[in-house]
Each structure stands twice: as structure tokens, then as C-alpha cells.
Amino acid sequence: MNQDPTQQLEPFLKRFLASLDLLYTQPTSQPFPNVESYATQLGSNLKRSSAIIVNGQPIIPSPQEDCKLQFQKKWLQTPLSSHQLTSYDGHLIPGTGTFVVHFSAKVRFDQSGRNRLGESADLFQENNSIVSKTNQRPIWGSWFGVDVNLVVDENVMQDGEIINSMDYRFTYVPNDSIIKV
């Protein structure tokens, strides 16, 4: 009996979204040795030569930095996020070894005023506060709607750089959010 080749897409998509939501300081696991090693894990499935579009704006590679690195740098500056996959559709393109995947998700952002590294724009940082930076909880805002189109290599069960193209687009922005996209 033939198995549906798209069956392996859902676990892959969940792993990819989890890579976009990584915490710099994980309370349950070994912390990252430095910011660079953390940043390289954000969207780690993207190929260095990936075509990346965010909200209709393409990320243009420079001679010094590829699209993946530029995306990771921009994503590092955003607040902490939490993605939730809502639906997906994928089609294997015969003879090419690639899937075309379209999925919808919800994402919410931390509205506490800190970026992914816990940095804020406060002029005076309280060094000896009762609550340390690692124990500060995110203040989640309302859910945004996201629509993503991917072109991925057929071997989606292997971790590695397998995303050839990504179009990440916000389809719903809540009125009560302080985050502007």
C-alpha cells in the first residue's frame, strides 16, 4: 500500500515553527553558548540561497550576507513569538524532488517591551531586582494570522537546510496589539 508523501509535512512544519519560537535562555535545557549560536537556530531549515519574502518585501542578499543570515538577524530583533499551526496543504511535484507547501498559522508576540534576548529600551536596568531576567514571563498579546508558502526538498524528515523558498505574510493583525507589522 502506498503511503501519502505529504504525511511527513505536519511534523516538519511544527519543528520549523518551533525554530522560529526558540528562547535564548531555555530553563529546561543547556543554554546557548553565545548569541550567534542562538541566532543560527532561528529558521535553521532555510537554505543559504533561499528566496525569502516577509509581508511582500523580499530579503535581498548582499555580497557579505546571504538571505538566511539577513532573515535570522531581523528575526532576532523581534519580540519573543509563539506559533500555532492551524492548517496546511502540500503537494509533491513529480520529478523535481520538492514539495510546494501552503500553511496557515497563528502567532502571538511578547508585548513586555523586550526582544528575544531579553533586552529592552529601558534607560535604567535594575540589576538586583527580585525577579531575574531568566524568570521574566512573556506578556502575550492577541493572535496574528499568518499565511506561509514554502518550497521544500522532498526529504523533509531530515533536519537540515531544506527550504528553498519562503513567503511569510501576515493576514490578520489584531487592533489591540502594540506590535506593528
UniProtKB/Swiss-Prot annotation:
InterPro entries: NTF2-like_dom_sf (IPR032710), Nucl_pore_RNA_shuttling_Mtr2 (IPR019488)
Compartmental location: Nucleus
Top-level taxon in the UniProt lineage: Eukaryota
Keyword set includes Transmembrane helix: no
Main location: nucleus
Organism field: Candida albicans
Function: Affects mRNA transport from the nucleus to the cytoplasm.
Pfam family, one: Mtr2
Assembly with partners or alone: Interacts with MEX67.
Name listed for the protein in its UniProt record: mRNA transport regulator MTR2
GO CC entries: nucleus
Key words, A-Z: Nucleus, Transport
